[in-house]
Regions:
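Short, flexible micro-motifs
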Residues: 12, 25, 46, 51-54, ...
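Short, amphipathic alpha-helical "lid/cap" segments that border enzyme active or binding sites
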Residues: 26-33, 150, 300-310
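Actinobacteria-biased recognition of intrinsically disordered, low-complexity terminal regions
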Residues: 1, 189-190, 319
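Alpha-helical structural signal in soluble globular domains
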Residues: 39, 63, 67-72, 96, ...
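C-terminal alpha-helical cap/extension of soluble enzyme domains
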Residues: 6, 11-17, 39, 225-319
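Active-site beta->alpha loop and helix N-cap motifs at the rims of alpha/beta catalytic domains
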Residues: 2-147, 295-296, 316
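A general structural signal for well-ordered alpha-helical segments in protein cores
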Residues: 29, 61, 65, 90, ...
Length: 319
């Protein structure tokens, strides 16, 4: 389906449910897409960090994306991560995603290798010119060790290379500078790239990003509570910033589930992704909360903590 320009609203990065042998659990994934659509989301982002894309084989990636596209059924656009180290490998993923029916692509800067901003620009231009789908840049320096400069993003937005940005840098100052470059809170639609989408990946500061002029959010926690993020977005759209802030504060408290796994026992990604999947299992959406190896599973004590946080947020577990 055609993307709105700019893409806006709540676009969760879809978790990839796994079976007991690590296979993609397509039945759970189909239920998850239904859960997200029932929550009112405006799009779906498959094969991102929250999808555990770095752990998935090419076959698993294809199965997950195919399942999301089929379950979405054209009701909302599906963005597909084409995440890999260098341009030729990203192009392979991009071609596969296009063949499976994705509506847009999401790619990071090259990583493992060290690249100059001009090389990063060439990377995105090659992707856009080779695969005819809208392209979103994914700014996640903690994973790729390169921060996309606001000047570079604005350049690629203005020349039509990029349809949007998913900003997971955590650098709120850089995000604000980019928004100002693009016309500021009230001048975006008449600025240098009126159809360019700026999406924050910082689920704890969505109200602030929307107030600054961002178009939407890509929240990992949105897997668990999509309706909450939609309420936040709708309140901001209506200019009801008090209601938006109240919803944001409830979601901040719920986000504490990501620390359910002790730091002495597992990585922070293992804890966060495990908590999202555990929450979805407790809510009856996923058959299990399995994460990809070698991430460690949450202990029973941690699972109980996730359940307590869900109840406190008004999302009582059914398991």
């Amino acid at each position: 389906m055609a993307l709105p320009a700019p893409l806006h609203g709540v676009i969760p990065p879809v978790c990839t449910p796994l079976g007991p042998q690590g296979e993609v659990d397509t039945e759970s994934l189909t239920r998850l897409v239904g859960h997200l659509l029932d929550g009112g989301v405006h799009g779906l982002f498959a094969l991102g960090s929250t999808s555990e894309v770095a752990y998935l084989t090419d076959d698993q990636r294809a199965t997950a994306l195919e399942t999301v596209v089929k379950a979405a059924g054209g009701r909302v656009p599906v963005l597909a991560g084409a995440i890999d180290t260098t341009t030729p490998r990203v192009l392979d993923h991009a071609r596969t995603a296009a063949g499976l029916g994705a509506d847009a692509l999401v790619a990071t800067a090259p990583f493992y290798t060290r690249t100059h901003p001009r090389e990063i620009a060439d990377h995105f231009r090659r992707l856009r010119s080779t695969v005819d789908l809208p392209l979103f840049a994914y700014d996640i320096p903690m994973a790729v060790h390169t921060k996309l400069p606001p000047s570079l993003v604005a350049e690629l937005a203005a020349d039509g290379t990029l349809a949007g940005l998913k900003d997971s840098s955590g650098d709120e100052g850089a995000l604000r500078r980019l928004l100002v470059r693009l016309g500021g809170r009230t001048g975006r639609r008449t600025g240098r790239a009126p159809g360019f989408a700026v999406l924050t990946g910082s689920e704890l500061t969505v109200d602030a990003a929307l107030l600054a002029g961002a178009d939407g959010v890509v929240p990992g926690l949105g897997n668990v509570d999509p309706a909450g993020y939609v309420r936040l977005y709708d309140a901001a759209l209506a200019g009801d910033w008090e209601r938006a802030a109240a919803e944001q504060e409830r979601l901040v408290a719920l986000f504490a589930i990501t620390d359910a796994g002790p730091e002495s026992e597992m990585g922070r990604s293992s804890s966060a992704l495990g908590s999202f999947k555990t929450a979805l299992h407790l809510l009856g959406v996923l058959a299990r909360g399995t994460t990809a190896f070698p991430q460690r599973p949450l202990s029973e004590q941690s699972v109980q903590e996730v359940g307590r946080r869900l109840t406190a947020a008004g999302l009582p577990p059914v398991r």
